[in-house]
Amino acid sequence: MAHTLQTVVLLLGTSILHPILADVNVMKDVTLGFGQALEKCREESQLTEEKMEEFFHFWSEDFKFEHRELGCAILCMSRHFNLLTDSSRMHHENTDKFIKSFPNNEVLSKHMVNLIHSCEQQHDADLDHCWRILRVAECFKRSCQEAGVAPSMELLMAEFIMESEIN
């Protein structure tokens, strides 16, 4: 009886955690994929080496959204992947396709697009695109953390190390 109860608890726990872990892994893949454009955008956004290093800690609790250059880098990276309209707002269809280009993409795509759109609406009045996109990124990060889909720094660093060893 005790063994059966343990099995039921284990199965329930696994069925509850599996979608969350899948979402976190998709978010990790999207983050790493999006980050590939950072080096290309470093100069255009006037990002110093120090600020570029900070950027790698985007998902950490103590990451600060206080430097305009970071918003400019996100703007450039978004343009690199054709994720923005001419007015520097999210291109919903292209963003959806970008997210869906990663493994297990169907899990999170619509949710991510909705989160970003909601954050954009909150900060739409800001005329400076770099500052606005930085505020949208801050809102998006907070929303992902609240939804439990933000990847941990440990997960990202492990993946980054594995990828660098392969290349």
UniProtKB/Swiss-Prot annotation:
Q: In which tissues is it expressed?
A: Antenna.
GO BP of this protein: sensory perception of smell
Going by the UniProt record, its keywords in alphabetical order are: Disulfide bond, Olfaction, Sensory transduction, Signal, Transport
The cysteines joined by S-S bonds are: 41-76, 72-130, 119-139
> Which residues belong to the signal peptide in this entry?
1-22
SMART domains (UniProt xref)? PhBP
- Give the stretches traversing the membrane: none
Give GO terms: molecular function aspect only.
odorant binding
InterPro entries noted in UniProt: Odorant/phero-bd_Lep, PBP/GOBP, PBP_GOBP_sf
Query: Which Pfam families does the protein's record reference?
Result: PBP_GOBP
Q: Which family does it belong to?
A: Belongs to the PBP/GOBP family.
Q: What does this protein do?
A: Present in the aqueous fluid surrounding olfactory sensory dendrites and are thought to aid in the capture and transport of hydrophobic odorants into and through this fluid.
Recorded protein name is: General odorant-binding protein 1
Which species expresses this protein natively? Antheraea pernyi
